[in-house]
Amino acid sequence: MGKIIGIDLGTTNSCVAIMDGGKARVIENSEGDRTTPSIVAYTKDGEVLVGASAKRQAVTNPKNTFYAVKRLIGRKFTDAEVQKDIAHVPYSILAHDNGDAWVATSDGKKMAPQEISAKVLEKMKKTAEDFLGEKVTEAVITVPAYFNDSQRQATKDAGRIAGLDVKRIINEPTAAALAYGLDKGDNKDRKIVVYDLGGGTFDVSVIEIANVDGEKQFEVLATNGDTFLGGEDFDNRVIEYLVEEFNKDQGIDLRKDPLALQRLKDAAERAKIELSSAQQTEVNLPYVTADASGPKHLNIKLTRAKLEALVDDLIKKSIEPCRVALNDAGLRSSDISEVILVGGQTRMPKVQQAVTEFFGKEPRKDVNPDEAVALGAAIQGGVLGGDVKDVLLLDVTPLSLGIETMGGVFTKIIEKNTTIPTKASQVFSTAEDNQSAVTVHVLQGEREQARFNKSLAKFDLSGIEPAPRGLPQVEVSFDIDANGILHVSAKDKKTNKEQKVEIKAGSGLSEEEIARMVADAEANREEDKKFQELVQARNQADALIHGTRSAITEHGSKVGGDVIGKVEAALADLETAMKGDDKAQIEAKSKALEEAGQSLFAAASADQGGAPGADAGNAGKAQDDVVDAEFTEVKDDKKS
């Protein structure tokens, strides 16, 4: 069995880790970075860019550059959070046929957020494969603890589209606790809080780490959060401030200009990061827009105090879930041994101050907020793969699960913060005389009224024997697996007729859609491989042409005119072939040129005493590595 890799699929950045020699380690991507921007871009020539290359070209291609799609995954288009996001992103968000929030490119190509996330997961998969030197097919992927069933299913689907068998979905704070807890050599029992404020989501979990019969047990006591609170919201506050200040000064609303908005987003994110270590920064965007009077420049000073005032309510919004989680765990702040900060936004001093004030203790600074979650996912992968022994993880379901009963009431069958995996059953009856079928409406949430909770699925149990209302007994059973994904069954206790359903929410992708997306991803991988091979053939041909022309100039007089004529003809043929996309043709014409110029290359080699670089006929082969590196650099420059 191959390695089970750990992936932190983040809103802003993603990270991949593996178990290596008994320790979890983060793997650097092809650019040498330990995290990868969760950004996917579609270029005019049909190329798909992922990560840093996608981020670099975002300013010039805002409508086809997709970021923060994790905030859309598993959500309906009509969700208030999605509607709020539409105003802040330059790309198009629209409703799919089933009501899900999808995205679209400027030429109308519609895609599910799962497809975009799959591209990021593919990049993580490739990063691990390059490091390990073997194929990777299995992964543990992290999600916010407060993700509901639809969002967890959607994340698993993204993994499938990327060609990964997702062995486990694990909550981000729990993963961070694993990374932190295993790093501690002692066997001391401790209760910790993981405060996870990432790019798009916020979670807080209260976790007990205990040594039970030589086994390190991580038990989640309570979790809470907000799946639409994160660094993106902090950035948006800065963007809104800059837009308003510029409008006051110049009378121009930059919200109507996608290019300007994308430049503002980059500048706002940079300014926010700078203000974690500086008291003041300057946002300077020359030629940000233009009107009839000419180009306009944006130059605005931003202080740390102003930034803190802009986001004060967002920071306060993160404290209430901390209070609820502590209360649900039956603990006080004084019972907590340590507070761990996870997520890039926790680097902000004001956030750290708020956490310190609430819990009455300084949060730990020895945990890398960008990498802890991926490391924990890799450890869980090691547990599942048998590489990590004596570790037991007991997670919880973040929200209550139940069904709608008479009068639109939400009846809970599994309470929030119940340790998973778990099963629970409850017996219900009919509401009408001689009722032959019941509809089971499965919901997730905390509100007493069913309509205010998240609808997960509806299914019918038919064939109930006619009887007065209240007599038939229908047993509804809920079964949550270790991924936090729900299976529901309803059984008529008299006839033993049963209806089972693995919750595939009314939102979400059908099996047919997933199969199509998997096939598309496979086709694209093959296409990318062919593209790289074509580029390599072109680069080798280009080096051969350059070497041949040099040989003609320096040594052409030593061979007959007929040889030069053949070489010139072969050169022209190769240059024509290079304008096309036929790799075989380019290789054939390259070979023809090498054969036509054999005597020329021999003369050049003899004249130079076989000096390095004189063998023009092997120019393409000898310099493969150099040419490839040059190609990569040129490509990036073109896209940025």
UniProtKB/Swiss-Prot annotation:
Residue ranges, annotated region (Disordered): 603-625
InterPro entries: ATPase_NBD, Chaperone_DnaK, Heat_shock_70_CS, HSP70_C_sf, HSP70_peptide-bd_sf, Hsp_70_fam
Induction details: By stress conditions e.g. heat shock.
Modified residues (Phosphothreonine): T201
Ranges of Low complexity composition bias in the record: 603-621
Name of one Pfam family that matches: HSP70
Superkingdom as given in the UniProt entry: Bacteria
PROSITE patterns per UniProt: HSP70_1 (PS00297), HSP70_2 (PS00329), HSP70_3 (PS01036)
Gene Ontology MF: a single term: ATP-dependent protein folding chaperone
Keywords: ATP-binding, Chaperone, Nucleotide-binding, Phosphoprotein, Stress response
Sequence similarity: Belongs to the heat shock protein 70 family.
Biological role: Acts as a chaperone.
Protein name per the record: Chaperone protein DnaK
Lineage: Bacteria, Pseudomonadati, Pseudomonadota, Gammaproteobacteria, Lysobacterales
Gene: dnaK
